[in-house]
Each structure stands twice: as structure tokens, then as C-alpha cells.
Design a protein with these regions (language model features):
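Short coil-to-beta microelement around the adenine-binding A-loop and adjacent beta1/P-loop entry
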Residues: 16-17, 84
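The feature captures the beta-strand-to-loop junction immediately N-terminal to the Walker
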Residues: 35-37
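Helix-to-loop junction immediately C-terminal to a conserved catalytic motif
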Residues: 50
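Conserved ABC transporter NBD signature motif
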Residues: 58-72, 127
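ABC ATPase NBD coupling module
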Residues: 67-91, 121-122
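Short coil-to-helix segment of the ABC ATPase nucleotide-binding domain corresponding to the Q-loop/switch region
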Residues: 103-111
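ABC ATPase nucleotide-binding domain helical subdomain, centered on the C-loop/LSGGQ "ABC signature"
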Residues: 122-132
């Protein structure tokens, strides 16, 4: 099953077009590497996938649920309730400065699954321990 699908994604910052017609599919359980030089749009692509950055154009779907569709040349986002449900299953781990500095590594890993997904604390901590 396709976990993440992005089609014809576009993103600009002013006159600088950072993402130009990017399309990709990630199957559930698949590992994907996004490689490129500094400033090539890797982080912007991930931020668009996580809906932390708005796309200027393109489609975005998770497990077949449309988060963003292209209409009349513009990206149109699904209703907030649909987006919240999708975001419960997709997240990012940021490098250094995006972590909560007053949390230890364990708390940074466990906070979202416990509070956003309402998962059992002991279960989440056991999974985090295994990952670390």
C-alpha cells in the first residue's frame, strides 16, 4: 500500500522556485533517502510532506487519503479534521535546534505519540527505548 504520495509538488519562496514538479511514492515500510546539496529543497520537501509548509501546487496523499489536491492550478487543502487525522500518523524528527531543549531525548521522542495519538505511555516508552 502507498503510504505517502506526492505528485507535481511546487514550492517557491518569492522568486526562488525551490520545488519544481516533484513526484514520489513511498510504500508502507519502505525507506527513502532524499539526497542533495545544501539549499536544494530537501528540508522544504519534508516540511511540505509533513504539512509544516504549504505547497504552491501539487497533490499530497497518505494511505489513499487526499490531504492536498490541485484545483485550478492551486493547492487546496482538505478540511482541518481530515488533516489532523492524517497528521496523527506522520511526523518528523528535527535536527538539534528543533528539539525541546528542556526535554531529554526520551521525552522528545515520546511526547507526540502520547499527547497527539493518545497512546499508552508505557507502550510508547518501551518502543522509544527499543529505537534508541
Amino acid at each position: 500500500m502507498i503510504y505517502l504520495e506526492m505528485n507535481h509538488v511546487r514550492k517557491s519562496f518569492g522568486d526562488l522556485e525551490v520545488l519544481k514538479d516533484i513526484s514520489l511514492k513511498v510504500e508502507e515500510g519502505e525507506v527513502l533517502s532524499i539526497i542533495g546539496p545544501s539549499g536544494s529543497g530537501k528540508s522544504t520537501l519534508l516540511r511540505c510532506a509533513a504539512m509544516l509548509e504549504t505547497m504552491d501546487g501539487g497533490d499530497l496523499a497518505y494511505l489513499g487519503k487526499q490531504a492536498v489536491t490541485m484545483q485550478n492550478g492551486k493547492s487546496v487543502y482538505a478540511k482541518p479534521a481530515v488533516l489532523r487525522k492524517i497528521q496523527e500518523n506522520f511526523g518528523m524528527v528535527f535536527q538539534s535546534f528543533h528539539l525541546f531543549p528542556h526535554y531529554d531525548v526520551m521525552k522528545n521522542l515520546c511526547d507526540a505519540p502520547i499527547h497527539v495519538q493518545k497512546r499508552n505511555r508505557a507502550e510508547v516508552e518501551a518502543q522509544a527505548e527499543e529505537l534508541l
